[in-house]
Amino acid sequence: MESTPFNRQQWTSLSLRVTAKELSLVNKNKSSAIVEIFSKYQKAAEEANMEKRRSNTENLPQHFRRGNLTVLKKKWENPAPGVESLPESTRNSSAEVRHRGDPPPAEVASSSASGVEADQGVCPRPRFSSPPEVPYPNPRIKDTEHLKDHSAESKKMENCLAESRHEVGKPETSENAEASNKIEKYNVPLNRLKMMFERGEPAQTKILRAQSRSTGGRKISENSYSLDDLEIGPGQLSSSAFNTEKSESRRNLEFPRLSDTSIKDRMAKYQAAVSKQSSSTNYTNELKANGGEIKTHKLEQKENVPPGPEVCISHQDGEKVSASENSLAACSTPPEDDSCKSQVKSDVQQPVHPKPLSPVARASSLSESSPPKAVKKFQAPARETCVECQKTVYPMERLLANQQVFHISCFRCSYCNNKLSLGTYASLHGRIYCKPHFNQLFKSKGNYDEGFGHRPHKDLWASKLENEETLERPAQLPNAAEIPQSPGVEDAPIAKVGVLTASMEAKASSQLEKEDKPAETKKLRIAWPPPTELSSSGSALEEGIKVSKPKWPPEDEVSKPEAPEDVDLDLKKLRRSSSLKERSRPFTVAASFRTASVKSPKPLSPPMRKGWSLSEQSEEFGGGVAAERKQMEKASASEKNGSVGKTTWPSKESRGGEAAGRSKEVQDFEIGSENLIENGASLDEGDRDLLQQQSPLEPKSKNWSSFADNTSAKEFTTQKQKSQDVEFWEGEVVEELSVEEQIKRNRYYDEEEDEE
């Protein structure tokens, strides 16, 4: 009993042999009856297996034969009968592929381990066949020539051999592994291998480019190598048929191998082929002839094949690939390699019209060509940009409002920047607003011309020249009558230059603010009701500095109707009676009363003065006179006492110590002062001057009430004259003095205050 290497196919017989050996080793001294029984059983089992295998392979059709070596030997030795049975063998091989499932994916991983055998590729085997024994020399020579001309086929055989080696381990077939060892020792001469790879590799890459371009990465079909073997020789028919079967069976696993060559290499070879395309015209006729042969053989193969889209597509693939390989077969010498490449390229570039196919094949080809059109239609819409951010708008975030395209996130109120929707927006002049701000700024107040700087209605009402004039007027300095005032100021008569300049400054500043912040200033301008403080005509400097002052004078004093003629008579009397020194002194000092009240207003308010009695006011007057008695000759003393006398004129009636003529003059002066109020002079300025004087006087005279009885009627009357002079000046000079003169007098007053 000879010991042979363990093979998975012969597990039954080998297990019997091992058992017999073990028994013989263990029972050396005992009888060998058990060993003989086992050996007989083993031989009987081997014979039964061999007979069963022979009967199966001989009775079954060719595509179900599981690799009997004797059948293969006969095919190699007698190649002539194989020529006749070529169409039948190709049909059966393709049918077997469809009956059989796809091979396991593990077969791809081991395909790289069989590189030497794939390159030699001498004996291609059907599926499940064991390695054959050494072939005869004549087929070997033919096969090496075949490989040298078709290296693409050798690469396919590499994968097929790897697959068949994995399938060998199945228990349906039986053969020893000696033949596989011999195949591994078999060598093709190195120079032939070198020539084969140098010539065939570019052709392989060109074929791969042709397939990937024409069919979009479809798998290699069953026809790709069986049809072009017609031109080779009778010895190669069976090998090509078996190779066709295996390439078709691995159609779903072949696509990763198509991309082994890098894109850069393929691009370089493609450019080289295009540059030499001019020499390809000689082979176009050959291509047509080969196409005719392909057509006939393909129709023969289609006889027993049920139509299916994948099969039809594979027929087209086989047609294109085989046409390119037939052109390679025509080029047998190395100098013609470049022309072969260029012809392959021309074959790829020519539109390959499918040969007469079944309707299913036509439908599949039409369905293949339709998707690119759909892609073009999808790219047809124009690129849209958002009105606000000027970026691309995609359909998911597109919002069409006011005939403009927005992002959903960019559709916001241009005033408050709140996010809006199609139901909560309003538009004016192409701008988007939320409805509350639109109503506030435009609709409810009729402010379409002012809001946000839009002035469509004013353009209709007034000409452009008038608009330009209104813009240029703040830069000029016209007279009081020519200046258009704001609606709140127009109602009152404008008599003072100070009020004029202040209103001009306010107007200019409001226009500057309007340019920077149009919305806010407009909201301020439309305030209602208009302010009425200006109708009482406050002083110019107080308006410029915008000091908040209490409401003064009281309404009962202002509302007394008086005649302006009495004022003129009284002023003439005062001007005659006063000396030149007394008349010129107020011009130097009196204007400073206003700035004093602006610079340091004291917390004493006029309503507190209303609560005082007449006796307290007279005592205050007496205390002020006693404190300043030594400084009566100075201008500051005359000012202060005069103003005190002016505002405390009601005390003269309660005391009753004055002459009747003097009291009449004081009453006339009262009338004149109230009329001056109506004409634009301010009575509350004098009251502020009084408050300014009282506050420095209080710390000087804490016992000011004790001096009230010491005052004489003569001093009181002289002070009344001076107070009348001061009041006369206040009513007269408002129209004569300019702002610059008032500033000069303010400086002079500050120096006098320091002297005190």
From Swiss-Prot:
InterPro entries linked to this entry: EPLIN_Lim_dom, Znf_LIM
Subcellular location(s) per record: Cytoplasm; Cell junction, Focal adhesion; Cytoplasm, Cytoskeleton; Cytoplasm, Cytoskeleton, Stress fiber
Compositional bias of kind Low complexity: 107-118, 533-542
Keywords tagged on the record: Acetylation, Cell junction, Cell membrane, Cell projection, Cholesterol metabolism, Cytoplasm, Cytoskeleton, LIM domain, Lipid metabolism, Membrane, Metal-binding, Phosphoprotein, Steroid metabolism, Sterol metabolism, Ubl conjugation, Zinc
Bias-annotated ranges (Basic and acidic residues): 44-56, 140-173, 245-254, 294-303, 512-523, 552-563, 627-637, 652-667
Annotated GO MF terms: actin filament binding; metal ion binding
Signal peptide boundaries: none
Entry keyword annotation includes Zinc: yes
Residue positions, PTM N6-succinyllysine: 435
Ranges where the LIM zinc-binding domain occurs: 384-444
Alphabetical GO biological process terms: actin filament bundle assembly; cell migration; cholesterol homeostasis; cholesterol metabolic process; intestinal cholesterol absorption; negative regulation of cilium assembly; ruffle organization
Stretches the record annotates as Disordered: 44-183, 204-377, 508-726
Polar residues bias: start-end ranges: 274-287, 638-651, 691-721
GO cellular component: actin cytoskeleton; actin filament; brush border membrane; cleavage furrow; cytoplasm; focal adhesion; plasma membrane; ruffle
Coiled coil regions, renumbered to chain: none
Superkingdom as given in the UniProt entry: Eukaryota
Domain notes: Contains at least 2 actin-binding domains, one on each side of the LIM domain. Both domains bind actin monomers and filaments. The C-terminal domain binds filaments more efficiently than the N-terminus.
Function statement: Actin-binding protein involved in actin cytoskeleton regulation and dynamics. Increases the number and size of actin stress fibers and inhibits membrane ruffling. Inhibits actin filament depolymerization. Bundles actin filaments, delays filament nucleation and reduces formation of branched filaments. Acts as a negative regulator of primary cilium formation. Plays a role in cholesterol homeostasis. Influences plasma cholesterol levels through regulation of intestinal cholesterol absorption.
Protein name: LIM domain and actin-binding protein 1
Naturally occurring in which organism (per UniProt): Sus scrofa
UniProt lineage: Eukaryota, Metazoa, Chordata, Craniata, Vertebrata
The encoding gene: LIMA1
